[in-house]
């Protein structure tokens, strides 16, 4: 949202999460994700200092790697259809990059990460060995970075996850 550096929709990412139910409705676990957003910028001239400038087209890229603790409240733990609400908290590594022909300018940074989500796991059999997982989420990270004349102050995304649960 409101991110001019790299604001295009992207499917380049993955998410893994594992948890343990400490009580029947509440689980605690860990997660790791990665995601990349890219945006093409037409040729333009950018001032680098008071006496120099760069003229080039650019490919902006923001790579994000959040990881940390995952918490989930399961509404119906005994059912084959298990709706839940959850939150993930942790650290977020990111790399903000601008590619210009044969040159790359980048800023690597760290921030705090939070991601609330709602979802459902639908098991194929009553034994709950394997199922389909779907979730909607929003995430925010406090990462800050600068590349050339561009800057970011916080990263946020929303998305939908579709995967397998076992």
Where do the protein language model's features map onto the residues?
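Flexible, solvent-exposed loop segments that connect beta-strands
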Residues: 1-7, 33-64, 91-110, 142-158
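Short glycine/proline- and aromatic-enriched beta-strand/turn motifs that initiate or cap beta-hairpins
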Residues: 1-23, 27-28, 165
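Exposed loop/turn and edge beta-strand positions of beta-sandwich/beta-sheet ligand-binding modules
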Residues: 12, 65, 81, 112-114, ...
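Membrane-embedded beta-strand positions of outer-membrane beta-barrel proteins
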Residues: 16-18, 30-32, 67-69, 83-89, ...
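Residue-level signature of outer-membrane beta-barrel architecture
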Residues: 20, 73-75, 120-124, 140, ...
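Repeated loop/turn-to-beta-strand initiation elements of outer-membrane beta-barrel proteins
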Residues: 25-28, 79-81, 125-130
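Outer-membrane beta-barrel "beta-signal"
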Residues: 68, 154-166
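Surface-exposed, polar helix/loop patches in the mature regions of secreted/periplasmic/lumenal proteins
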Residues: 70-103
